[in-house]
């Protein structure tokens, strides 16, 4: 479980330059917030949408506000892509994810592959498990879809996970669905057909595909249950 910082109600005015978004606060003030999501945020960046932002006055920050959540399709969606790694890390430590139980060590951001860092490296003696975490916010017809924009980086990660399996290790591509209205996860072939091809190839070559739904609220975010990955 991840405890959210105090969240401030706001209304989205616009998102622009990928990492910036303007909001109107309840007192009418207009503020600019950092958008911690490099994807297209399709369906999650509609002007006029209710949102929650956080504030941090740490010295050196260019923007004191960060966009955390948005309300779309009558539900709250977590758009901060820095949170899923922490959610999965905490869930593994708490034995919430039964498929990843029994490991003695969890290390974040470990170098591997070609100039890459694995999100989480699990170990048990000489046994290694490489876990790549992906945040999912796009939904169509009750299915969570990834990615919401073409991702060369995501394609690279799948190739590197396949290489880890070839070397005799365990590798997992882990989807965190930060919205409650999805019953399954699938590749967004219409957006990035190459990612879809590589995801199917990775699954056929031993990379495990896991997906968990996250319960998003103003106070907390936590993983609740596994979702099927439909290829």
Swiss-Prot record:
Record-linked InterPro entries: SfsA, SfsA_C, SfsA_N
Domain of life per record: Bacteria
Lineage of source species: Bacteria, Pseudomonadati, Thermodesulfobacteriota, Desulfuromonadia, Geobacterales
GO MF annotations in UniProt: DNA binding
Family: Belongs to the SfsA family.
Protein name: Sugar fermentation stimulation protein homolog
Pfam families: SfsA, SfsA_N
Residue runs in coiled coils: none
Disulfide-bond pairs as recorded: none
